[in-house]
Swiss-Prot record:
It holds the Pfam family LRR_1. Mostly expressed in developing organs, including bud clusters, flowers, siliques and young rosettes. Also detected in mature aboveground organs, such as leaves, stems and pedicels, but barely in roots. Homodimer and heterodimer with ERECTA and TMM. Interacts with EPF1 and EPF2. Interacts with SERK1, SERK2, SERK3/BAK1 and SERK4 in a EPF1-induced manner. The keyword Transferase applies. SUPFAM superfamilies: L domain-like (SSF52058), Protein kinase-like (PK-like) (SSF56112). The active site is at D773. This is LRR receptor-like serine/threonine-protein kinase ERL1. It is a single-pass type I membrane protein. Glycans are attached at N68, N77, N226, N237, N308, N332, N377, N412, N441, N460, N532, N537, N547. Its EC number is 2.7.11.1. It comes from Arabidopsis thaliana.
């Protein structure tokens, strides 16, 4: 009995010690966590549950994960919380930690040496912060560590050789720092290392032959350092490599022959000083998807055997000194999307076999010595988006079959020997945004069809032999930013229609034979910063408006009869002409008689018309048809509107669109309205036009601008909309209002509102409606920055039984779905592509197209390099509390802009993801009246965790976000 009592007492004591030990450990870990929190800054609404007074259960704290048995802290995940401050040395007191993830914050200071005390650590990610100083040697004490990610900080010093003492290290990523010194050869003897990322540092030394000792290494990236020497001859022994990137260093010598033994998918050697020939053995590397040898000093011909690379999608050989012809065998590279051979010394003709490359997206052959014509077979490259042969010796004419290149946006044939007329068929390449035919021998007149290229940004026809008049149709180029027709033989007057071009930056007309006056209408081109009309035969007064004072006098020289303040010449009478001949006098007399007859007829008809109009006031009112669609405008007449706006005086103008001018009208006893005056008069099918307006007017949604009514008159068709106090999203991001800072919460609110409006059109309207021109300038913002979709002047209803509609060109350059550009068929997925571009604008603050830069292509290239976050607008990163939301929004934007429309989400799914990023309280407070489809999503989100819902949705579309897969 006594022995039993002793055993019981002993057992209770042991349990007591265990409980005390656990409690003591939890107490110590709780103190460590509070010390870690104390070293952070920018904690607004963050880590509120880290409170050891009111919540002692530290395992329930945000980002803290505990072991199920010992209840010790084993994982700390505070990634993408926008945390500032430093990493506390107290982190070393969490001895049982297996994972630390602090990436995507703004942590500064040095990495504490105490982190080496976390002996159980397997995963350490401190990337994308502001950490500086050396990498602590204490990290080498972490014998269980498998992943060390310190990329994109400001770390200095060498790569510690002691990292080789971590026996289980599989992934080492130190890219994007300021590390110096050589890469330790000991690092190459880590048998388990699989991923080595050292790009974007200042490392020196050479590539060691020991690099192939890493038998498990598949990713080797030292891009953008200061490495010298040659590529080791033993490079062919690196048989495990899948990605090999040694680009943008100072590597010299020739490419080793045995490099062909590699089985890499990506071989990037560009931006070095490599010499010699391209080894033919590269043509045997069947796994190659990307081959980049550009910007070196390679010589010799392009090996025809490269045509065997049937899986290669990108071939970059530009910026070398390659000679010889372009091998016709390249036409066998069936998956080739990018072929850049520019800036070499290639000769011969363009092989017709390139026309077999059905997936070719970009073909750049500029700055070589190519001769002969452009093969008409090139028009068979249905996906071709960019074609550049600038700076060659090509001749002949432009193939008429180019009209079939519906996806082409960039065409540069400048500085060659092309001749003949510019074919009218170029006007059928509807998606062109840059057309450069300068520096050739084109003759004849400029085709009027070029005025149909409504998405054109740059038109350069300079230095040719073009004659005839400058087409008035150029006034239809609503998106144009630059027109250059200098150094030709053009005659006639400067068309007044050019004054309609609201985006025009440069108008270069010098060295022609233009006559007449400079149109006053050009003063309406408020964005015009470069005007050159020198050396023509212009006369009269230079427009005296003040905005013309920004042009230098040199812009007007060489026109003897031009005068005005801007050119320093006082206007006086023109020189007396010589005495008229007898024949001239007879012609003048006959002309005067004819003119008098015409005036008499005009006066007579006018009097007859007045008699008809004076018949009754009711008939007079019939000339203008006013239709009120909502009762809030019913008390007003057309005369009220004209009186308030002084017959649409220009002082009431608040904006210009591609098809209209917009005025503000402040009516009494009602809210202000926006009046959109369409450029076109009565449409061909008036009944269809009115039916469409009535359909648009029937749409009532909090995120769609309401059409209150319309007026049809001979003086112009007017549409009456809600007036939006904060203008358009484009104005706030890119225009004169961009001084208004948009924080992340406001941008997300705008994205959610626009998505809900578009989802309503796609899923809740009967028949459903496709907007067809989603862009930032068509997203208007009220006084509360609530988004409203506008500009349904081109939207059409689609019967429920149809899945697509064929129509004329719609949309705006930079937002147009490439699939629509290729097939001319449009559906809901086209709107979703455009919405994805708007999301990218919100995230980056950049324009969809800026000069020649394309925002979508920029983000794709950064996705390739995993540097997308570098493109984020600073105002977003400063105000976003969870950078993970930004990454999700980038993912969503890239999914919306997938090349294959079938892989894009629906607007319901887009709304679901965006709503999941809005805190639940904000959703409840700021989105009180939702449409039916959005309410269903809200109900789902009440049942399930929003983040989990978003995660489930992303799983459905799971894949690596990279250029090759989008």
């Amino acid at each position: 009995m006594k022995e039993k009592m002793q055993r019981m007492v002993l057992s209770l004591a042991m349990v007591g010690f265990m409980v005390f030990g656990v409690a003591s450990a939890m107490n110590n870990e709780g103190k460590a966590l509070m010390a870690i929190k104390g070293s952070f800054s920018n904690l607004v609404n963050m880590l509120l549950d880290w409170d050891d007074v009111h919540n002692s259960d530290l395992c329930s704290w945000r980002g803290v994960f505990c072991d199920n048995v010992s209840y010790s802290v084993v994982s700390l995940n505070l990634s993408s919380l926008n945390l500032g401050g430093e990493i506390s040395p107290a982190i070393g007191d969490l001895r049982n930690l297996q994972s630390i993830d602090l990436q995507g914050n703004k942590l500064a200071g040095q990495i504490p040496d105490e982190i080496g005390n976390c002996a159980s650590l397997v995963y350490l990610d401190l990337s994308e912060n502001l950490l500086y100083g050396d990498i602590p040697f204490s990290i080498s004490k972490l014998k269980q560590l498998e992943t060390l990610n310190l990329k994109n900080n400001q770390l200095t010093g060498p790569v510690p050789a002691t990292l080789t003492q971590i026996p289980n290290l599989k992934r080492l990523d130190l890219a994007g720092n300021h590390l110096t010194g050589e890469i330790s050869r000991l690092l190459y003897w880590n048998e388990v290392l699989q991923y080595l990322g050292l790009r974007g540092n200042m490392l020196t030394g050479t590539l060691s032959s020991d690099m192939c000792q890493l038998t498990g290494l598949w990713y080797f990236d030292v891009r953008g350092n200061n490495l010298t020497g040659t590529i080791p001859e033993s490079i062919g022994n690196c048989t495990s490599f899948q990605i090999l990137d040694i680009s943008y260093n100072q590597i010299t010598g020739e490419i080793p022959y045995n490099i062909g033994f590699l089985q890499v998918a990506t071989l990037s050697l560009q931006g070095n000083r490599l010499t010699g020939r391209i080894p033919e053995v590269i043509g045997l590397m069947q796994a190659l998807a990307v081959l980049d040898l550009s910007d070196n000093e390679l010589v010799g011909p392009i090996p025809p055997i490269l045509g065997n690379l049937s899986f290669t999608g990108k071939l970059y050989l530009h910026g070398n000194m390659l000679t010889g012809p372009i091998p016709s065998e390249l036409g066998n590279m069936s998956r080739l999307s990018y072929l850049q051979l520019n800036d070499n010394k290639l000769v011969g003709t363009i092989p017709p076999e390139l026309g077999k490359l059905e997936q070719l997206f970009e073909l750049n052959l500029a700055n070589n010595r190519l001769v002969g014509p452009i093969p008409s077979n090139i028009s068979s490259c249905a996906a071709l988006n960019q074609f550049n042969v600038h700076g060659n010796l090509l001749s002949g004419s432009i193939p008429l079959a180019f009209r079939n290149l519906g996806s082409l946006t960039y065409l540069n044939l400048s500085s060659n020997n092309f001749k003949g007329k510019i074919p009218v068929e170029l006007g059928h390449i509807i998606n062109l945004d840059k057309l450069d035919l300068s520096g050739n021998n084109f003759s004849g007149s400029i085709p009027l069809t070029l005025g149909d290229l409504e998405h054109l940004l740059i038109l350069n026809l300079s230095r040719n032999h073009l004659s005839g008049q400058l087409p008035a149709e150029f006034g239809n180029l609503r998106s144009i930013q630059m027109i250059d027709v200098s150094f030709n033989l053009l005659s006639g007057v400067i068309p007044t229609e050019l004054g309609q071009l609201q985006n025009l930056n440069s108008l270069i007309l010098n060295n022609n034979k233009l006559h007449g006056k400079i149109p006053d209408q050009l003063t309406n081109c408020f964005t015009l910063v470069n005007l050159n009309v020198s050396f023509n035969n212009l006369s009269g007064i230079v427009p005296p408006m003040k905005n013309f004072s920004r042009f230098a006098p040199a812009s007007f020289v060489g026109n003897p009869y031009l005068c005005g303040n801007w050119v320093g010449s006082i206007c006086g009478p023109l020189p007396k002409s010589r005495v008229f001949s007898r024949g001239a006098l007879i012609c003048i007399v006959l002309g005067v008689i004819t003119l008098l007859c015409m005036i008499f007829l005009a006066v007579y008809k006018s009097m007859q018309q007045k008699k008809i109009l004076q018949g009754s006031s009711k008939q007079a009112e019939g000339l203008t048809k006013l239709v009120i669609l909502h009762m809030d405008m019913a008390i007003h007449t057309f005369d009220d509107i004209m009186r308030v706006t002084e017959n649409l005086n220009e002082k009431f103008i608040i904006g210009y669109g591609a098809s209209s001018t917009v005025y503000k009208c402040a009516l009494k006893s009602s809210r202000p309205i926006a009046i959109k005056r369409l450029y076109n008069q009565y449409p061909h099918n008036l009944r269809e036009f009115e039916t469409e307006l009535e359909t648009i007017g029937s749409i009532r949604h909090r995120n769609i601008v309401s059409l209150h009514g319309y007026a049809l008159s001979p003086t112009g068709n007017l549409l009456f909309y809600d007036y939006m106090e904060n203008g358009s999203l484009w104005d706030l991001l890119h225009g004169s209002l961009k001084k208004v800072k948009l924080d992340w919460e406001t941008r997300l609110k705008i994205a959610v509102g626009a998505a809900q409006g578009l989802a309503y059109l796609h899923h809740d309207c009967t028949p459903r409606i496709i907007h067809r021109d989603i862009k930032s300038s068509n997203i208007l913002l009220d006084e509360n920055f609530e988004a409203h979709l506008s500009d349904f002047g081109i939207a059409k209803s689609i019967p429920a039984s149809k899945t697509h509609a064929s129509t004329y060109v719609l949309g705006t350059i930079g937002y147009i779905d490439p699939e629509y550009a290729r097939t001319s068929r449009i559906n809901e997925k086209s709107d979703i592509y455009s919405f994805g571009i708007v999301l990218l604008e919100l995230l980056t603050g950049k324009k969809a197209v800026d000069n020649e830069a394309n925002l979508h292509q920029l983000i794709l290239s950064k996705a390739d390099d995993n540097t997308v976050m570098e493109a984020v607008d600073p105002e977003v990163t400063v105000t976003c509390m969870d950078l993970g939301h930004i990454r999700k929004t980038f993912q969503l934007a890239l999914l919306c802009t997938k090349r294959n429309p079938l892989e894009r989400p629906t607007m319901l799914e887009v709304s679901r993801v965006l709503l999941s990023l809005v805190p639940s309280l904000q959703v409840a407070k700021k989105l009180p009246s939702l449409d039916h489809s959005t309410k269903k999503l809200q109900q789902e989100n009440e049942v399930r965790n929003p983040d989990a819902e978003a995660s489930q949705w992303f799983v459905q579309f799971r894949e690596v976000i990279s250029k090759s897969s989008i």
